[in-house]
A protein has these predicted regions:
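Distinct, well-ordered alpha-helical segments
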Residues: 1-11, 31-40
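A short alpha-helix capping/helix-coil boundary motif
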Residues: 17-19, 71-73, 157, 168
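Hydrophobic/aromatic-rich, well-ordered segments within soluble, folded domains that form packed cores
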Residues: 17, 109-112, 176-183
C-alpha cells in the first residue's frame, strides 16, 4: 500500500503520473494470483497504464535476501516443478490478459536462463541456457483465450458407466468429471 499511497498523494498534489511499473521477480509459490490481481486493480484506480517489468519466475522459493544465485550450476528439474512453473506463468498471463485495458506491456528480465541475474539453475525465463524455448514459452505464446474464462456448469449427474447405485464419478454436460476421494488422515 505504501507505493499506492505515495503515487496517489503525488497525483493529488498535481504531479502528472499516468502509469506505473510493477517489477515481477516472482517464484512458483508467490505472490498469489489473488495478490497480483488485487495490486493491478488497486493501481488501476490511480493510473491509466501499468507495465510489468523485469519479469522472471524462478523455480525456488527464496525471496528477498534469501535468494540463491547459481551461475554455471545445473541440476535436473523434477517434472512437478516444471508443471508448477508453467502453471505460474499461465496464471500470471491469464491475469494480465484479463486486465489488458490497463496492463500495456510485459518486459522480461532477459530472454534466457543463461543470462539471468539469478543464474541458470533458477530457470526463471522463457528460454533455456541454450536459447531454446522452454515449455513456459509455449504456455505464454500459445494460450487458448477460451480457457481464460471457463465456467463449469454445475449440472453433474452420475456417469452412465458407474456400477449400479454408485454416485461417483459424476459428469456434466460439458464433459467434466467429478470424483470423490476418500483419504485417511
Amino acid at each position: 500500500d505504501r507505493i499506492y499511497d505515495m503515487v496517489k498523494k503525488m497525483k493529488d498534489a498535481g504531479v502528472p503520473i499516468h502509469g506505473i511499473g510493477m517489477q515481477g521477480h516472482y517464484n512458483i509459490y508467490g505472490p498469489s494470483n489473488e495478490n497480483l490481481e488485487a495490486a493491478i486493480v488497486k493501481y488501476s484506480e490511480i493510473v491509466d497504464v501499468i507495465h510489468f517489468t523485469e519479469l522472471d519466475i524462478r523455480i525456488n522459493e527464496e525471496m528477498g535476501g534469501g535468494l540463491q544465485f547459481s551461475r554455471g550450476k545445473e541440476a535436473p528439474v523434477p517434472a512437478y516443478i516444471q508443471t508448477l512453473h508453467q502453471a505460474k506463468y499461465a496464471d500470471l498471463f491469464k491475469i494480465l490478459r484479463r486486465h489488458k485495458d490497463v496492463v500495456k506491456n510485459v518486459t522480461f528480465w532477459n530472454l534466457s536462463d543463461k543470462d539471468s541475474w539469478l543464474g541458470a539453475n533458477n530457470y526463471p525465463l522463457p528460454f533455456d541456457k541454450d536459447y531454446k524455448p522452454k515449455a513456459v514459452y509455449r504456455t505464454i505464446k500459445n494460450f487458448d483465450p477460451a480457457l481464460d474464462n471457463v465456467e463449469i456448469k454445475e449440472d453433474f449427474v452420475p456417469s452412465v458407466m458407474n456400477q449400479p447405485q454408485a454416485e461417483y464419478p459424476m459428469v456434466n454436460s460439458q464433459g467434466y468429471a467429478r470424483f470423490k476421494v476418500f483419504a485417511p488422515q
